[in-house]
């Protein structure tokens, strides 16, 4: 449903989803599958702790990343490749109470985030309903290359948010 083109939540099928399982693994949308048409065969099962080990790496090549992702698969014979955002999902799922991540690129939000004034416009809430739906504030991450750099920056921003507000953010 997140990938339904009529909803405008995922430009050109981009975006990813993940779901945490009780055993410390998670399902993640595999590379090459679109949100609009994905079914149960479009997900790869990953070990959360093994993916989170990437946070300890500083400079990692794309080739090394692929090897580490292969080692983090629940089924080493699974030919599906995890999304480049596997670490971003693992980070989000590692926080207390988070069981599902819907990482989308909504058309209406992208039109706002591409504006030079966006960071300033994001500050503060105007309406009580906005606070209920989006929280007291949002996590804002400046454009960063996808993969490990984006995941690490997102973790830094989430942790800063938690220190400031004492809760995990509702919107990023």
Regions flagged by a language model, labelled:
Residues 1-172:
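Glycine-rich flexible loops
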């Amino acid at each position: 449903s997140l990938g339904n083109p009529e909803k405008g939540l995922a430009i050109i099928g981009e975006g990813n989803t993940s779901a945490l399982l009780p055993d410390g693994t998670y399902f993640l949308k595999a590379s090459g599958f679109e949100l609009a048409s994905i079914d149960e065969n479009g997900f790869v099962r990953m070990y959360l702790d093994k993916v989170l080990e990437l946070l300890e790496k500083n400079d990692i090549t794309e080739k090394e990343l692929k090897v580490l992702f292969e080692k983090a698969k629940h089924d080493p014979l699974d030919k599906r490749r995890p999304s480049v955002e596997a670490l971003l999902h693992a980070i989000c799922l590692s926080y207390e109470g988070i069981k599902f991540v819907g990482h989308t690129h909504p058309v209406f939000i992208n039109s706002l985030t591409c504006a030079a004034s966006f960071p300033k416009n994001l500050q503060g809430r105007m309406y009580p309903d906005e606070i209920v739906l989006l929280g007291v504030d949002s996590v804002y991450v400046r454009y960063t290359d996808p993969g490990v750099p984006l995941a690490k920056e997102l973790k830094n921003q989430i942790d800063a948010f938690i220190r400031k507000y004492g809760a995990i953010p509702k919107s990023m």
